[in-house]
């Protein structure tokens, strides 16, 4: 019966586990344990796994008994090592061409029959029952092997014999993880774990090997058995693919290799050789030395020139340009070679390539400046070029890693206790960390390089000096003693003067010194027809010295940091995995040694069952294997630390089908640990959820405490126990009691609380509120769905008629502190999902809306916070206590900063001072003295100055002064609306002053001239969009004292009459000032509106609309909206300023004093008597 030996692929690593330990364990087993499957129908030992593992070369703590004891008649013994290693092979890869197949096996051929001398599997150890989690630490302490020695330290244990072919030798410790090799790259040696052999045993072994080679002509396999005089067999595992066939006995045994890696696309040999050669060139010491010298030259040469005093000569300039051109060529070649050798690893995905390219291009700017006869000293003055070049050069600091690896890196010693050296992980750490450090340092350097030191001689001072010289030369002449004395004095005080030309004539010149300096080190000042050149090399020298020091300092810092990073990365140890890896390697090695015997028995047993008829040899062999296995079991129990009694439970044949594999046990143990961790994680997550819920409940209790505090303060303040907050809270509780188990029950709008404006279709427009209670208005102000900015502006401007600022802050605080118990009925409170959903969808949005409302309140309508300690206390509690507790520290800090900034910039309005009436002497003086202001200055200049005065008064008017008809109160108007009162008084003063100027002239001709000036003044006011001033003029001309002067009006020119008629048409009150409203609606520039019209509109809105809807608690919000629209119309003109200069000469003569309406009337009568 034919049997087939199959080599299976390693088991796939479970990559779905949360921890990376399983990945490394499975990778270690996959690398070290090729799995064999033995099909044996006679002994029913199918699918038995035999592992051949070769891990670290350590031989300590692994004392195993002799395997495969054999004698001619059963009495002799011999020790041999079985090492069946099958590795994957890729014939196209040059890595495997030098390796030949090698299969070491111990077989004896007698009378054409093959007898296997391999031990049967060992009895069960049951490690799963004995080595559990509690004694795992004890096991680690007892059986952790020492670090793996390197090949150079194993001269006493291993001697590697050189074969006729060359192989790639790699240490099998975990330091080889970073090499990208297949299984066939590793040179395994399990003979290290064997005890020393005696001389007789060695001779018997050699005889057996010779018999084996002579008696197996039909077996096609590659045997390469190496032995040495030190009783250690160094076996070399090479990549083989073999097929064993025995036609005479009917045996067909095939061995299949691992599936090779996916082949790379074949590359042309010439191109590969060229790439290798180029890689060797750019990695050579000479190339690196040239690169470092080039970078140093580019970085420092220009600063050195500047620090040397900016010397200039053809030799210096051309030599430096030649070197820089050479560096450009060298850098270009370096970039091309890197592109060819590293391809995608260098371009285009890395920043190194682009900065190298920019650095290369930046050197071209030097040549460009030089060819255009500019200075060579570009880096010392041109900051941008310096920064680009430093960035491109400093990014090459990665050379430090190469230099370290080549000259400074030390080999890892066994005494260091490292199980994992720097590998791809370390290299990646170097690259990532180095790039971040370099970019950070370059960012700092970028900022510091902006510090360019200029000359301390101001340009304005030099130009002033040149102007003085030109004035002296034009006045006295260049040869005059006045000019000569001043110039000589200037020359003595300015030793850096190089060249002077005044009025196109050279006065002073130092050509030798000018030619010896760089062009940019000479400051050239031109003004009109004069030129002055000044030597600036001293300041350039100072700047270059500072730049040199800074550059050297940054380079030293980068070198030091990179050396530390590289050094640490090359000594990297994965400490958390040391113990696990030790367990894996120890158990897998012992499992490999035992399974070699079991697997060999299966293979050879298959041969014997089909080729021999005698069972005596098999029985004797079974007894020998049983005795050997007994000793091996004891050694394993002692080495692992297990004290199981199951060693006596073996069957008569010495085979235990239920023995667990140590690797399987380890994986099972890891699974159990993972299950325990998963259960613990779930428990922690559950407790975290519970803690989160409790934390939210504590937060609710905390904010509800502030609600009660606000309520208590409100009750104390309201002596008559008018309790709006308590009424609001009580209504909320009643609604909760009446609500159904729906989520938005409390947010439904009732006509008893709010009414909306009807649209054209007769349906309510939910965006326009017409009537609502104060509680509903507060809810709409802080809606969770969206923050209505228009509504907020209207409310915050007009709410004071129904709420005080303190009450509004209390309501907003309560709204911010809203909790599920205040908004959700009991049925929904019982559901954690509903509560959490409400917190996410409602509570957070409501708090954000309250934050936006307070931010708008403080930012625009902040006059409520001035001198109001109660309001400040509430605001301070909200910002410093409640909001931080609710995890809104950033929001609290933001609005607190706005509040502090507004308080710091607050300027209190000056107290109102009423205009004192004129005394009798002042009245007499006004009537007698002639006022020539309208004739002494241009009428446009007078109009501009009056406009500027009126705009200053207009822009000082606050929005709150328009509320509740404050300017109409008889006793409180000067306190509530002081700026409006001042503006109105100014209107009357100007109007009376113009009337006085007209009627105080005794002659008609003089009065006509004054009337023409006054009408012209009105025209200029209209051109300036000063309709307030235009109305002042119109009211003075239409006054009874001026309009009655018929004889005077008859002599006014027709052009002035037409201008007056045009002004009267514009400001006509017909159709509610239709013409004026149309004109001002089109005004897009600075403007002073006629404020009397808007005061009339506010009066009409206030008196024509009720505050409440039909004696209910519904506030007429439409009225508030109309008031806000009118006020905002006025306020929009305050934000556009007039950009004219004040004329103090005109303002000093503006004295808007008038004797009063009665005296003006009498003066008018004296000008023209009444008609009888």
From Swiss-Prot:
SMART domains attached to this UniProt entry: RasGEF, RasGEFN
Molecular-function annotations in GO: guanyl-nucleotide exchange factor activity
Keyword tags: Coiled coil, Guanine-nucleotide releasing factor, Membrane, Transmembrane, Transmembrane helix
Membrane topology summary: Multi-pass membrane protein
Transmembrane is among the record's keywords: yes
Residues spanning the membrane: 286-306, 320-340, 347-367, 378-400, 432-452, 545-565
Subcellular location: Membrane
Domain called Ras-GEF: residue spans: 938-1170
Domain N-terminal Ras-GEF, first and last residues per copy: 765-903
Function: Promotes the exchange of Ras-bound GDP by GTP.
Gene Ontology biological process terms, A to Z: Ras protein signal transduction
GO CC terms, sorted: plasma membrane
Coiled-coil regions listed: 666-702
Disordered: annotated segments: 34-100, 138-162, 186-246
This protein's name: Ras guanine nucleotide exchange factor W
Chief place where the protein resides: membrane
Domain of life: Eukaryota
Biased composition (Low complexity): 34-70, 78-87, 194-241
């Amino acid at each position: 019966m034919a049997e087939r030996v199959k080599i299976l692929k390693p088991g796939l690593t479970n990559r779905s586990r949360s921890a990376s330990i399983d990945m490394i364990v499975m990778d270690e087993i996959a690398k070290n344990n090729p799995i064999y499957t033995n099909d044996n129908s006679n002994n029913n030992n199918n699918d038995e796994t035999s592992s051949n593992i070769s891990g670290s070369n350590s031989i300590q703590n692994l004392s195993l008994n002799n395997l495969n004891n054999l004698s001619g008649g059963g009495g002799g013994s011999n020790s041999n090592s079985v090492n069946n290693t099958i590795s994957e092979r890729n014939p196209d890869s040059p890595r495997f061409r030098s390796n030949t197949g090698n299969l070491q096996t111990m077989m004896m051929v007698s009378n054409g029959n093959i007898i296997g001398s391999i031990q049967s599997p060992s009895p069960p150890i049951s490690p799963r029952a004995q080595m559990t989690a509690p004694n795992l630490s004890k096991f680690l302490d007892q059986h952790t092997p020492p670090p793996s020695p390197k090949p150079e330290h194993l001269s006493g244990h291993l001697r590697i014999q050189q074969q006729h072919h060359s192989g790639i030798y790699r240490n099998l410790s975990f330091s080889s993880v970073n090499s990208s090799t297949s299984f066939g790259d590793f040179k395994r040696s399990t003979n290290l774990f064997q005890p020393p052999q005696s001389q007789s045993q060695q001779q018997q072994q050699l005889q057996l090997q010779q018999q084996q080679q002579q008696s197996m002509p039909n077996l096609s396999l590659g045997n390469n058995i190496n032995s040495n005089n030190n009783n250690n067999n160094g076996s070399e595992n090479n990549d083989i693919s073999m097929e064993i066939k025995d036609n005479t006995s009917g045996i067909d045994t095939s061995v299949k290799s691992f599936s090779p890696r996916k082949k790379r696309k074949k590359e042309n040999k010439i191109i590969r050789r060229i790439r290798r050669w180029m890689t060797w060139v750019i990695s050579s010491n000479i190339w690196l030395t040239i690169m470092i010298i080039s970078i140093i030259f580019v970085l420092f040469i220009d600063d050195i020139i500047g620090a040397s005093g900016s010397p200039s000569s053809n030799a210096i300039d051309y030599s430096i340009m030649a070197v820089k051109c050479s560096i450009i060529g060298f850098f270009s070649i370096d970039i091309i070679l890197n592109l060819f050798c590293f391809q995608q690893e260098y371009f285009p995905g890395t920043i190194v390539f682009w900065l190298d390219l920019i650095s290369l291009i930046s050197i071209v700017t030097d040549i460009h400046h030089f060819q255009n006869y500019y200075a060579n000293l570009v880096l010392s003055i041109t900051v941008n070029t310096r920064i680009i070049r430093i960035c491109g050069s400093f990014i090459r600091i990665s050379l430090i890693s190469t230099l370290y690896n080549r000259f400074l890196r030390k080999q890892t010693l066994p005494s260091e206790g490292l199980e994992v050296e720097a590998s791809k992980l370390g290299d990646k750490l170097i690259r990532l960390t180095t790039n971040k450090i370099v970019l950070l340092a370059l960012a700092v350097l970028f900022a510091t390089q902006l510090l360019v030191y200029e000359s301390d001689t101001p340009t304005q001072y030099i130009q002033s000096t040149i102007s003085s010289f030109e004035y002296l030369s034009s006045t006295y002449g260049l040869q005059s003693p006045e000019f000569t004395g001043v110039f000589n004095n200037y020359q003595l005080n300015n030793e850096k003067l190089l060249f002077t030309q005044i009025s196109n004539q050279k006065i002073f010149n130092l050509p030798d010194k000018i030619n010896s300096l760089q062009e940019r080190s000479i400051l050239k000042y031109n003004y009109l027809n004069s030129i002055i050149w000044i030597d600036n090399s001293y300041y350039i020298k100072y700047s270059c010295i500072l730049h040199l020091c800074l550059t050297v300092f940054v380079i030293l810092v980068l070198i030091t940091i990179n050396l530390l990073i590289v050094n640490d990365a090359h000594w990297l140890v994965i400490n958390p995995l040391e113990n696990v890896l030790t367990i894996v390697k120890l158990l897998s090695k012992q499992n490999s040694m035992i399974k070699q015997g079991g697997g060999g028995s299966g293979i050879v047993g298959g041969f014997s069952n089909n080729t021999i008829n005698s069972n005596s040899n098999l029985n004797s062999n079974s007894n020998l294997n049983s005795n050997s296995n007994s000793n091996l079991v004891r050694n394993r129990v002692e080495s692992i630390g297990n004290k199981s009694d199951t060693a006596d439970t073996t069957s008569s044949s010495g085979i235990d089908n239920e023995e667990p594999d140590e690797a399987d046990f380890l994986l099972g143990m890891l699974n159990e640990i993972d299950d325990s961790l998963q259960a613990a994680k779930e428990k922690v997550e559950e407790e975290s959820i519970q803690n989160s819920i409790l934390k939210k409940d504590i937060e609710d209790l905390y904010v509800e405490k502030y609600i009660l505090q606000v309520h208590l303060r409100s009750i104390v303040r309201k002596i008559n126990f008018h309790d709006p907050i308590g009424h609001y809270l009580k209504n909320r509780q009643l609604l909760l009691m009446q609500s159904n188990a729906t989520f938005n029950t409390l947010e439904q709008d009732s006509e008893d609380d709010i009414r909306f404006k009807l649209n054209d279709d007769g349906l309510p427009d939910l965006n326009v509120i017409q009537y609502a209670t104060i509680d509903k208005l507060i809810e709409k102000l802080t809606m969770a769905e969206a923050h209505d900015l228009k509504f907020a502006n209207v409310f915050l401007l007009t709410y004071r008629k129904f709420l005080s600022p303190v009450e509004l802050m209390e309501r907003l605080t309560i709204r911010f502190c809203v909790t599920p118990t205040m908004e959700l009925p009991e049925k929904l409170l019982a559901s954690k999902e509903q509560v959490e959903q409400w917190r996410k969808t409602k509570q957070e949005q409501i708090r954000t809306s309250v934050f936006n409302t307070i931010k708008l309140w403080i930012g625009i309508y902040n006059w409520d916070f001035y001198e109001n300690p109660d309001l400040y206390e509430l605001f301070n509690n909200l910002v410093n206590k409640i909001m931080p507790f609710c995890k809104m520290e950033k929001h609290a800090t933001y609005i607190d900063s706005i509040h502090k900034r507004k308080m710091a910039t607050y300027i209190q309005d000056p107290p109102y001072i009423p205009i004192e009436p004129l005394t009798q002497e002042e009245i007499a003086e006004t009537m007698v003295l002639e006022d020539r202001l309208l004739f002494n200055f241009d009428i446009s200049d007078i109009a501009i100055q009056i406009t500027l005065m009126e705009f200053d008064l207009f822009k000082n008017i606050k929005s709150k002064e328009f509320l509740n008809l404050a300017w109409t109160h008889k006793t409180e108007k000067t306190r509530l609306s002081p700026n409006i009162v001042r503006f109105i008084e100014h209107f009357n003063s100007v109007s009376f002053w113009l009337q006085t100027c007209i009627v105080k002239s005794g002659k008609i001709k003089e009065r006509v001239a004054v009337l023409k000036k006054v009408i012209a003044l009105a025209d200029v006011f209209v051109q300036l969009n000063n309709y307030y001033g235009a109305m002042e003029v119109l009211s003075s001309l239409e006054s009874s004292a001026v309009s009655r002067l018929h004889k005077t009006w008859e002599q006014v020119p027709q052009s002035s009459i037409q201008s007056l008629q045009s002004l009267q048409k514009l400001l006509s009150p017909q159709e509610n000032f239709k013409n004026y409203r149309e004109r001002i609606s089109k005004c897009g520039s600075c403007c002073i509106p006629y404020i009397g019209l808007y005061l009339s509109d506010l009066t009409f809105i206030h008196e024509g609309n009720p505050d409440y809807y039909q004696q209910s608690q519904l506030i007429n919000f439409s009225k508030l909206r109309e008031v806000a629209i009118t006020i905002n119309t006025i306020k929009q003109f305050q934000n556009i300023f007039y950009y004219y200069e004040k004329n103090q000469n005109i303002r000093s003569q503006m004295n808007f004093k008038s004797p009063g309406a009665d005296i003006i009337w009498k003066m008018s009568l004296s000008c023209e008597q009444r008609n009888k």
